[in-house]
Amino acid sequence: MKEGIKLEEIIQLLEQNRLAELKEILIKENPIDVAEVFEEFPKERDLIIFKLLPKDFSSEVFSYLSPEKQQEVIENITDEEIKFIMEDMYLDDTVDFIEEMPANIVDKILKNTSHDKRKLINQMLKYPENSAGSVMTVEYISFKDSYTVKQAIDYYRKIAIDKEETDICFVTDNKKKLVGIISLKTLILSNDDSYIKDEMDTNFVSVLTKDDQEETAALFRKYDLTTMPVVDHEDRLVGVITVDDIVDVIDQENTEDIQKMAAMNPSDEEYLKESVMSLAKHRIIWLLVLMISATFTGMVIKKYEEVLQSAVYLAVFIPMLMDTGGNAGSQSATLIIRGIALEEIEFSDILKVIWKELRVSVLVGFILSGINFLRIYYFTKSGFETSLVVAISMFLTIIMAKVIGGVLPLIAKSLKIDPAIMASPLITTIVDTAALIIYFQLSVIFLHI
């Protein structure tokens, strides 16, 4: 929270029963900060704080609480208090909240929600998970294209108090088809007698309810939007997506990508709140896949067993070659995956990527293998031929690893597979196997084993 209030101060005021003073302090704070403090308190005390707050303020605090705390509150407040919270919460926040609750809590919530809002909630819940429809809100302002500016402003003043999106308004025709958008600034600065259809902007970006939320987030980023209309297959306006919800989507998608890049199945749960069994379940499958795929490395070593028996010292350099190759491939893969996510790189750029990674890998490989040659030759006394074999192996491994790391995510994207899957663990497994083959083959050629 802000420096003006501390957790210890709240505890002290509670223990001294100075509730009026505590209330005055809390209502001056941002609801998000109050929600953070609320999360720190045990059940007996947090409900005292919650009931102490004014109803409109407490409902806003409620929307920022974790699902666990929200459930705790709902289980311990009256039906009348639930009704007020539900009516005061924005619809999209209400839907997000309901999706996290068990059936008995959902029944209690819907029982204390107005018929109109309950109908809207049920409608929103029908949209597919991770679709544009699932993250939109219907609390927006729209005008008919036949309105004058004065009529629109009068209408705005009448309904804006209950709407989530008020900076951008939407214009529809008599069939509810979206025909334009108009900002509040444009509305206020326009002549009262002008028609909305003459002042609106017809160059807008919209998405369908079924469109993927990740693609929607990309459009927000590309066009620098704060609000985007959502339409049905007949271009009728059904909702809008606001930037605060898209930020949540971006966070969610980034988290999923990071988890996939670490060879885990994505999870929406917070780490400290997720059970041990759940964490193990999300990790074990990919670990099994990678463990089995790593047997190829063992097969290569077994094939060249005679080479190793003839020159045991070659085994000393295997970990260094494999680790360097894996790291080199991961660097390229990470940059390409990020470029794909930001729509900076497409499959059609694959030749450009290969050419760039080739040049980078030659430069990096030359420097690393040169340093490595000198290090091995002068400090390990392994001899010129051995030092040369290791250096050339490293040079070729880095080139191969960087090209593979750059190409695999693009191939995955073209096959409609998440590029994040083609990340560090998988690329490392492929590179390890190839690096060993290069190393042993060069050893046979140069060392005459």
Indicate residue ranges for each PLM-predicted region.
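Hydrophobic packing positions in regular secondary-structure scaffolds
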Residues: 1-265
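Alpha-helical membrane-interface segments at transmembrane helix boundaries
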Residues: 273-285, 289, 301, 305, ...
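Interfacial loop-to-transmembrane junctions
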Residues: 411-431
